Every structure is written in structure tokens, then in C-alpha cells.
């Protein structure tokens, strides 16, 4: 398993890859935020990323479909309070299946498609998980598209 740690807005998160020895090529825009390691106290979110970490099942309580223009999210919640999110591109081709506990501090993700789709899926999964896990710390994630 390879681990990448990042520090954004003075808080950290860790990605653990079960099948990729060095996944930095999937996250070029995160390069300025890479740190060598984080303590558990510094980390607000941990995500395990692997080929068989998560599947998306429609058997859970449906929360909603969200069309965000270039991305589409299908969200459900299971009986344990965990969220399951299928992240797709604008053509509704799956890029990532994400499962998160209630506060998004622990996540698992499986990526789909070619390298471009995997970058898209992982980037969106990190953005969603970071936004929800950081909320309880008073951190607001603002997408670059709203600052123009």
C-alpha cells in the first residue's frame, strides 16, 4: 500500500492506494500540498483507494441525483449511516464509487475508466470528502469556478 499525505488550509488528509505504487500522477494539481507525513491529530480525512474498495449499490436509501454540469453525483445512504456516492462525468459514465462514514473522516473509493477518468473521479471524490470532513472544523471549501 502506498500513502500520500496532503495539507490544505492547515489541515491534512491522507490517501492510501492499495493497487498503485505511486499515484502522484493522478493528482498533479495537488503537488503544492504534498507533505511527507501527518500525525493522526493533523488528519481530518483518510481515504483508501483501490480496485475493489467500493461498488455502488442502488439498494440503499436514495438521497438524490445532482447534475453539476461537468459531473453527476448519485447519492444514497445505507442503514449504517454511511454515504455512497457514484461520481460520473457529464455523459454519466462512472468515474468513481465513494463510500464515506457519516462525517466523511473515513472513506473508500474505487476508480473506473482510463487515466483521465480516474483523475476526474479521484479529484471529485477528494473534493467532496474534504468539504464534508472539514465542515465540522469551520472550513468552507470554495470551488475555483465561483471565484472568477
Predicted segments with their positions:
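A noncatalytic interaction/capping subdomain that flanks phosphate/NTP-handling catalytic cores
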Residues: 1-146
Amino acid at each position: 500500500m502506498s500513502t500520500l499525505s496532503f495539507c490544505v488550509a492547515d489541515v491534512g488528509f491522507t490517501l492510501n492506494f492499495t493497487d498503485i505504487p505511486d499515484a502522484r500522477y493522478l493528482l498533479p494539481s495537488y503537488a503544492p500540498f504534498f507533505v511527507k507525513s501527518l500525525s493522526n491529530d493533523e488528519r481530518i480525512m483518510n481515504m483508501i483507494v483501490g480496485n475493489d474498495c467500493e461498488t455502488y449499490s442502488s439498494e440503499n436509501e436514495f438521497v438524490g441525483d445532482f447534475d453539476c454540469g461537468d459531473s453527476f453525483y448519485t447519492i444514497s445512504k445505507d442503514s449504517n449511516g454511511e454515504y455512497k456516492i457514484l461520481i460520473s462525468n457529464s455523459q454519466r459514465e462512472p468515474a468513481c464509487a465513494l463510500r464515506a462514514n457519516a462525517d466523511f473522516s473515513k472513506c473508500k473509493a474505487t476508480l473506473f475508466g482510463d487515466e483521465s477518468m480516474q483523475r476526474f473521479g479521484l479529484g471529485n471524490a477528494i473534493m467532496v470528502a474534504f468539504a464534508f470532513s472539514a465542515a465540522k472544523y469551520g472550513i468552507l471549501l470554495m470551488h475555483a469556478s465561483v471565484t472568477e
